[in-house]
């Protein structure tokens, strides 16, 4: 049976980084990865920013699919934290080894998101508005949601763990 990808998504300001940090501290058997962890090195390799050059997003996604495949080859389960949505994965194309994708959305209300993003250095109003639009798109695309305005990062991490355990309980 082909392994599945387990993806935790959320628009900017959704609390992905805080939830990921708390999830890693749980020391679960799952291996967590943030799409940004290879961003600087991949940009250096590509000679362009993978953060802003849309022509590099497909190859960067393909690189991550191979990293995640390596985890599965070692008999482990990876969970991938990314702002991507299902249409992004469709555009890249799922790799042949992948048996499907399970999605979990971290989300919060627009006011909370706006406050979080405005507190970040360098965030403009246009960037905040784009993040709000991204959040609305994700709400339409992903059914399973954890509200990070209602949960602490530790509670969100616990919800992520419960989601993973429910989906993988027959695989162990």
Model region roles, listed by residue range:
Residues 56-99:
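Glycine-rich phosphate-binding loop used to anchor ATP phosphates in small-molecule kinases
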Residues 119-162, 167:
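Small-molecule kinase domains that catalyze NTP-dependent phosphoryl transfer to phosphate-bearing small molecules
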């Amino acid at each position: 049976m082909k392994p599945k990808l387990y993806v935790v998504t959320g628009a900017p300001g959704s609390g992905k980084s805080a939830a990921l940090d708390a999830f890693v501290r749980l020391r679960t058997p799952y291996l967590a990865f943030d799409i940004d962890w290879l961003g600087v090195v991949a940009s250096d390799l590509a000679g362009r920013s993978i953060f802003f050059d849309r022509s590099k997003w497909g190859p960067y996604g393909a690189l991550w699919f191979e990293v995640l495949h390596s985890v599965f080859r070692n008999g482990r389960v990876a969970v991938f934290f990314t702002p991507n949505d299902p249409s992004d994965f469709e555009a890249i194309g799922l790799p042949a080894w992948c048996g499907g994708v399970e999605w979990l959305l971290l989300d919060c209300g627009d006011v909370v998101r706006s406050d979080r993003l405005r507190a970040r250095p360098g965030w403009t109003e246009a960037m905040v508005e784009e993040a709000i639009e991204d959040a609305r798109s994700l709400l339409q695309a992903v059914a399973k949601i954890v509200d990070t305005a209602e949960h602490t990062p530790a509670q969100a991490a616990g919800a992520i763990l419960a989601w993973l355990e429910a989906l993988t309980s027959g695989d162990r």
